[in-house]
Regions:
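A short, proline-enriched helix->beta-strand linker immediately N-terminal to the Walker B motif
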Residues: 171-175
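ABC ATPase "signature
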Residues: 234-238, 246
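Conserved ABC transporter NBD signature motif
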Residues: 64-76
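A short, surface-exposed alpha-helical micro-motif characterized by mixed small hydrophobic
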Residues: 219-221
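Helical segment within the ABC ATPase nucleotide-binding domain
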Residues: 192-205
């Protein structure tokens, strides 16, 4: 398989209030193949979101990428200029946030917001973008896909808004989508429905994914492989089946003891 993402010896530093630098990501390395969905899992503070953001060339406020490389489709996101990164974001690499509500402007229609990235980057005509959006609404099992785009964010459910957030990320046919705990606020039944819809569209399109979560039961629904993180370090990497059926690291087994799949 061809790798879309290659992270090598990634290090990220944070600056404390006293001005001291602390390494919060310490030498993390892993790959993501084309069309593969990889989950980053660990407790709060394990570094999973920090690592995911480096795939867009981002560092959190007060942090900096201090070492290693982050390659996406042959581009090192660490060394690209900000102008070059801006071209990659929204086209080759996209992001689905934890809060779909925060991603939408309450005063604009859903359709206008979903297709906005295609206008910004000149990816297709407005008519083509609207047709593509309806295709995605259908593929993501949204009700009334032909007309849901004319609604406003407050007129759809939380689960529907999360799927629409995914449609926004997928509209430009990206190579990689980063999902940052997007189903946390949903009930279990809705979570499963949304995850299945995400996975179906990703697999049909051959799109790679990074799924950030603290919940192994959730990632079992969508991930091909799992990277277990603690304290900014990799503790275990394996296929979802390998991790669920034969976890080797004590921390992974601890996470498994908290779930029922």
């Amino acid at each position: 398989m061809v790798n879309l993402v290659e992270i090598r010896d990634l290090k990220v530093e944070a600056t404390t209030d006293s001005g001291r630098r602390v390494e919060i990501i310490n030498g993390v390395s892993f790959d993501i193949a084309e069309g593969e969905i990889v989950a980053l899992i660990g407790e709060s503070g394990s570094g999973k979101t920090t690592i995911a953001l480096t795939l867009m060339g981002h560092a959190r406020p007060g942090c900096r990428i201090s070492g290693g490389s982050v390659s996406v489709a042959g581009k090192d996101m660490v060394t690209l200029s900000e102008k070059q990164r801006a071209r990659v974001r929204g086209t080759e690499v996209t992001y689905v946030p934890q809060s779909a509500a925060a991603a939408f402007n309450p005063a604009a229609t859903i359709m206008d917001q979903v297709i906005e990235v295609t206008r910004i980057h000149g990816l297709m005509s407005a008519d083509e973008a609207r047709l593509r959006a309806v295709e995605l609404f259908t593929a993501l099992s949204l009700p009334e896909p032909e007309t849901i785009g004319s609604r406003y964010p407050h007129q759809v459910s939380g689960g529907q808004l999360q799927r629409l957030s995914a449609a926004m990320a997928l509209i430009g046919d990206p190579k990689l989508v980063i999902f940052d705990e997007p189903t946390t606020a949903l009930d279990v039944t809705t979570q499963i429905e949304v995850l299945r819809a995400f996975k179906s569209v990703m697999k049909k399109g051959g799109i790679s994914g990074v799924y950030v979560s603290h919940d192994l039961a959730v990632v079992a629904q969508i991930a091909d492989r799992i990277v277990v993180l603690k304290g900014g370090e990799t503790k275990e990497i394996g296929t979802t089946k390998e991790i669920l059926d034969g976890a080797k690291h004590p921390y992974t087994r601890e996470l498994l003891s908290l779930i029922h799949i």
